[in-house]
Every structure is written in structure tokens, then in C-alpha cells.
Design a protein with these regions (language model features):
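Basic, amphipathic alpha-helix used for nucleic-acid engagement in HTH/winged-helix/SANT-Myb modules
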Residues: 1-24, 30, 35-95, 135-139
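Short, basic interhelical loop/turn and adjoining N-cap
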Residues: 38-55, 104-127
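Acidic, proline/glycine-rich low-complexity IDRs
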Residues: 121-139
């Protein structure tokens, strides 16, 4: 895992824990909290501009095969980025700019959700509580 990707992962974990703290007070169970956190709006897309560029450049020319083979949350994330790309590329300041340039701004836009399953949120929550947000997966 590269340093850049890990900083995104740590930031995502921080944001998940923050949202969990806000949402857990109104939930009747932890499972309900995990579900609500997973569908809660996120402050950004947790993907690097390079990764977004690699997937979106194929989608722009009509090749959705790589994205369609992904897990459901990841697929939703890239389709959401693609829809946002269509809107953002029509803005005056982005007309005529390269996809690579646009992706740098696109991934920092607010995301409609965290694009994680409730099980993943639970895993992250438990690991963060036990080891802190900087734990490394041994997968």
C-alpha cells in the first residue's frame, strides 16, 4: 500500500469514526448505526486521482467492463464519479481540460455515501477502537 493510499485510508477511518459518533446517539443498535454510517454522505471520494483516472478514462469511451466486475459498493462509487464527471466537465472552468486534471478535483468533491457495506463499517469501527486509525490490514 502506498503512502498516499494509506493517508486516504486513515482519513476515511477518521471520517467514519466521526460520523459514527454523531449517528450512534440516535440509533437503537450498533447494526443500525453501521447501516446509517455506510449510507451517510462522505466529505470526499476515498480514491486517489490516479485510480479514478484509470477507471473513468475507460468509462468515458464506453468500456464499463472493468467497473462492472467490481464489488457492489466500489461499482456504485465509480458510477457516481462518472455521473459527477459529466456534470463537472460542463462547468466553465473545466471545459477543455484533460480528464487527468479534472480527476484531481473530482475525488475531493463530497460523496453521496461512504461506498462501504455495513459489514466493512463494522470491521473498520472495531479495528479503530482496538488499534487506532493507523492499523494496517494483513490481507
Amino acid at each position: 500500500m502506498t503512502k498516499t493510499n494509506f493517508s486516504l485510508t486513515a482519513r476515511q477511518r477518521e471520517d467514519i469514526m466521526k460520523v459514527y459518533g454523531e449517528i450512534a446517539l440516535t440509533c437503537h443498535s450498533q447494526q443500525e448505526a453501521y447501516i446509517k454510517v455506510a449510507s451517510h454522505p462522505a466529505p470526499r471520494y476515498y480514491v486517489s486521482p490516479k485510480q479514478a483516472f484509470e477507471r473513468l478514462r475507460r468509462m468515458v469511451v464506453g468500456d464499463f467492463s472493468e467497473v462492472d466486475a467490481m464489488t457492489e459498493p466500489r461499482r456504485r462509487m465509480y458510477y457516481s464519479l462518472f455521473e459527477k464527471l459529466k456534470k463537472v466537465s460542463q462547468r466553465k472552468e473545466f471545459i477543455g481540460q484533460s480528464l487527468h486534471f479534472i480527476c484531481q478535483f473530482l475525488v475531493s468533491e463530497p460523496a453521496p455515501e461512504f461506498f462501504l457495506s455495513p459489514v466493512s463499517v463494522q470491521y473498520i469501527f472495531n479495528k479503530c477502537k482496538r488499534y487506532g486509525k493507523d492499523f494496517r490490514d494483513n490481507k
